[in-house]
Amino acid sequence: MGPGPEFVGRAAELALLAGLADAAALGEGGVALIGGEPGIGKTRLADEAAARAPCLARVRARAVPDEGCPPYWLFRQVIGEVSKTFIPNELQHARLSFLAQGPQAQPARLDLAEQRFAVFEAVRDYLTAAAAGSGLVLLFDDVQWADPPSLRLLRHLAEGVAGSRIVLLITYRIPRPAGGTS
């Protein structure tokens, strides 16, 4: 399969996203939310922006409209991809254990909210460490379908990327107005 059609337009948006990537390469991560109606090109814009940031590694996660999706599905995808690229094989077991146990893996002396916060911090620290070398673009696609735990963790990560080499590109669908055409 060859490259897609040439990307045209959206110069202002690409410049803004390139600025985020440049800042992340210097240790000032950032977040971009890309929203719009279905089919408007949100994913293509995010893909193009990520491809134009060759100094940063890229990882993609996509939410799916499936109620059977496991909790933290977006981050299971991200951690799986990041671990293949950034951590040695001997650490794979620890990663799999973390994913299998989730928030319940924390000491029993913590209440559920404290356990969740500890896991969120661990995920942010893990991704920040993985991005410390080359930097990292994390593309979260179709988050309108994300499970609630993934959304909480994504918000936590977004609030803490400022001092990292991480760029979060988050695409989401804005529903068309009911009964209207635009």
Tell what function each PLM region has:
Residues 1-182:
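Key residue(s) within conserved catalytic/signature motifs
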